[in-house]
């Protein structure tokens, strides 16, 4: 090939790589396939909507999965989405605001799910939606504001549900509707104004319902006769003498009511609020009672007029954002004896009438900032029998009317001064059964309880030893002293993690510091020292430098460095990370792995090196990683593995070598026997060379078939010569012209940009 040809090829490759680099930030969700602006995740048995959907997505296929809930954050930021396919899942709940960001949405399919109710104003942000399929669900009612905001809908399918109530005005905004299917439901009555505002309606199906043809439905007969091409086969199901008659054929005089009903000819569709009661619960007198029903999540779309919700003795784990915000009249909320471990900061937002909140007997460890903000009417707050280990100083700042606060039986070691200052009406407080450290930082509490003898449960000190088991309210102030160790411990336990300074551009929640998707090229300074999980994925790292940052993070257990551009890890980069047990380096640009890269990771159990460019695994690549149990080298460019490469991984129980182009020559013979003996490999890594072994599992190849015949002696683990002996090399240019060569010379540098082979004796293209 001529020099010009190679230069052209080099330029083309550079251009392709440039384009790929620009596309890379639009990562495709795991398991899904992406093409252009289409993301296809159908039929993958997904239980939740996958994360990291590219922001430029215009079509998203999620049909045929096992998704049960659509949260308000699942589609956040997808402002270009036009087509959303959610049919054939198990969706029973859609949170308010779930489609708020979908400003360009045109088609939405939710058919064949388990929807019983959907929130009012769900489609408020989808002004361009023109096709909506909700058929084959279990929808019972269509509330008045169901389609508010979706003014452009032309095709609405609601057939094969259990609809028995359509509130007056439910379809009022749909003036451009052309297709409406309501067949195969439980509809008995419709208000006279239901369809009068649809001048473009050309397809209308109402058959197979329970229409009761009394005086209130006489209007429908006239309406259908005026439109002979729509509403075909719409029949009466009652009264008995009209059963089976086509509504359009029944005469006006036959639509009769009892004497008592005659005076109410102008029938108005009833409120559907009675139908908003979850199937497992009972609803009466504005009380929703769901006690002991095995619920795993908060029921949604309850009657907005409720004043009390009883959800105790269930298996609820998470209280999502705005879970109760629609219920402005709520006065009492009981969530005791569940499994709650996660509370959204705005879980109780807007509950200005709430006076009783019961949360005892759960697994709450921390109260998010602003959790009780705006609860000005609250008088009773029971947080006992949880695992709360810290209180923010402003946790109760709006609870001016609180009478009783129970923090009994938690994990509090200290309470910051001023935490109870806003509780002007407090009469009773329970603080016992907490492991209080009675040092100088808790002196204020003793003074507070001396002045305000409201603590009635007998709160006692656990440490230091000199004050152990003594009642806090009875200890003299001078006894509360700090030694160095106690001072450090109490300072840590008295602060909640989210209150501490978070690095710029990062997000901090609990012990997780999330610095992903911020275009970072180095690890931020001042990572909180109690960080347990550090997320640095989806950034611009090229080299992981040895800065000593991990020496300052004694609690660190997991580091995520996936989806960067890392080509090298400096020796000592992980120095000090002795407690880390999981590192994710998936989707980077590492070409080799050396033991010096992982120095300091004595406790590492999981090492993910998927989707890099590794070509060789040497016999010292993983030296010092004796605790590693899971090692993934999936989807690299590995052609060979040096004997003994995994010998130092004494704890290894899972090894993934799939999707690599293994060259099954004499250098790989040892691996087949090793795989058969160890039985720890995932799947069946296969040979790709030589040709007669292509796609055969390595462990199935006979030892005598691992040969280096016919010039197949490549070993990517051997040091590469700088230049073939037959050629001359200058920088990245290799000249082998007019050398009488019959085969391609060995030892051509991997970084070659120009290769001259003209004037030789090749009979086949090398």
From Swiss-Prot:
<dbReference type="Pfam" id="PF13855">
    <property type="entry name" value="LRR_8"/>
</dbReference>
<feature type="disulfide bond">
    <location>
        <begin position="440"/>
        <end position="482"/>
    </location>
</feature>
<feature type="repeat" description="LRR 14">
    <location>
        <begin position="579"/>
        <end position="600"/>
    </location>
</feature>
<dbReference type="GO" id="GO:0090027">
    <property type="term" value="P:negative regulation of monocyte chemotaxis"/>
</dbReference>
<dbReference type="GO" id="GO:0090260">
    <property type="term" value="P:negative regulation of retinal ganglion cell axon guidance"/>
</dbReference>
<dbReference type="GO" id="GO:0030336">
    <property type="term" value="P:negative regulation of cell migration"/>
</dbReference>
<feature type="repeat" description="LRR 4">
    <location>
        <begin position="128"/>
        <end position="149"/>
    </location>
</feature>
<feature type="glycosylation site" description="N-linked (GlcNAc...) asparagine">
    <location>
        <position position="560"/>
    </location>
</feature>
<dbReference type="GO" id="GO:0010593">
    <property type="term" value="P:negative regulation of lamellipodium assembly"/>
</dbReference>
<dbReference type="GO" id="GO:0036120">
    <property type="term" value="P:cellular response to platelet-derived growth factor stimulus"/>
</dbReference>
<feature type="domain" description="LRRCT 3">
    <location>
        <begin position="660"/>
        <end position="710"/>
    </location>
</feature>
<dbReference type="InterPro" id="IPR032675">
    <property type="entry name" value="LRR_dom_sf"/>
</dbReference>
<feature type="disulfide bond">
    <location>
        <begin position="727"/>
        <end position="736"/>
    </location>
</feature>
<feature type="disulfide bond">
    <location>
        <begin position="664"/>
        <end position="687"/>
    </location>
</feature>
<dbReference type="GO" id="GO:0042802">
    <property type="term" value="F:identical protein binding"/>
</dbReference>
<dbReference type="GO" id="GO:0070100">
    <property type="term" value="P:negative regulation of chemokine-mediated signaling pathway"/>
</dbReference>
<dbReference type="GO" id="GO:0008285">
    <property type="term" value="P:negative regulation of cell population proliferation"/>
</dbReference>
<feature type="disulfide bond">
    <location>
        <begin position="506"/>
        <end position="515"/>
    </location>
</feature>
<dbReference type="GO" id="GO:0090024">
    <property type="term" value="P:negative regulation of neutrophil chemotaxis"/>
</dbReference>
<dbReference type="GO" id="GO:0005737">
    <property type="term" value="C:cytoplasm"/>
</dbReference>
<dbReference type="GO" id="GO:0043394">
    <property type="term" value="F:proteoglycan binding"/>
</dbReference>
<dbReference type="GO" id="GO:0003180">
    <property type="term" value="P:aortic valve morphogenesis"/>
</dbReference>
<dbReference type="GO" id="GO:0043065">
    <property type="term" value="P:positive regulation of apoptotic process"/>
</dbReference>
<dbReference type="GO" id="GO:0071456">
    <property type="term" value="P:cellular response to hypoxia"/>
</dbReference>
<dbReference type="GO" id="GO:0031290">
    <property type="term" value="P:retinal ganglion cell axon guidance"/>
</dbReference>
<dbReference type="GO" id="GO:0007409">
    <property type="term" value="P:axonogenesis"/>
</dbReference>
<feature type="glycosylation site" description="N-linked (GlcNAc...) asparagine">
    <location>
        <position position="66"/>
    </location>
</feature>
<keyword id="KW-0524">Neurogenesis</keyword>
<dbReference type="GO" id="GO:0003184">
    <property type="term" value="P:pulmonary valve morphogenesis"/>
</dbReference>
<feature type="disulfide bond">
    <location>
        <begin position="723"/>
        <end position="729"/>
    </location>
</feature>
<dbReference type="GO" id="GO:0051058">
    <property type="term" value="P:negative regulation of small GTPase mediated signal transduction"/>
</dbReference>
<dbReference type="GO" id="GO:0010596">
    <property type="term" value="P:negative regulation of endothelial cell migration"/>
</dbReference>
<dbReference type="GO" id="GO:0002042">
    <property type="term" value="P:cell migration involved in sprouting angiogenesis"/>
</dbReference>
<feature type="repeat" description="LRR 16">
    <location>
        <begin position="627"/>
        <end position="648"/>
    </location>
</feature>
<dbReference type="GO" id="GO:0030425">
    <property type="term" value="C:dendrite"/>
</dbReference>
<feature type="glycosylation site" description="N-linked (GlcNAc...) asparagine">
    <location>
        <position position="619"/>
    </location>
</feature>
<feature type="repeat" description="LRR 5">
    <location>
        <begin position="152"/>
        <end position="173"/>
    </location>
</feature>
<keyword id="KW-0325">Glycoprotein</keyword>
<dbReference type="GO" id="GO:0001701">
    <property type="term" value="P:in utero embryonic development"/>
</dbReference>
<dbReference type="GO" id="GO:0090288">
    <property type="term" value="P:negative regulation of cellular response to growth factor stimulus"/>
</dbReference>
<dbReference type="InterPro" id="IPR003591">
    <property type="entry name" value="Leu-rich_rpt_typical-subtyp"/>
</dbReference>
<feature type="repeat" description="LRR 2">
    <location>
        <begin position="80"/>
        <end position="101"/>
    </location>
</feature>
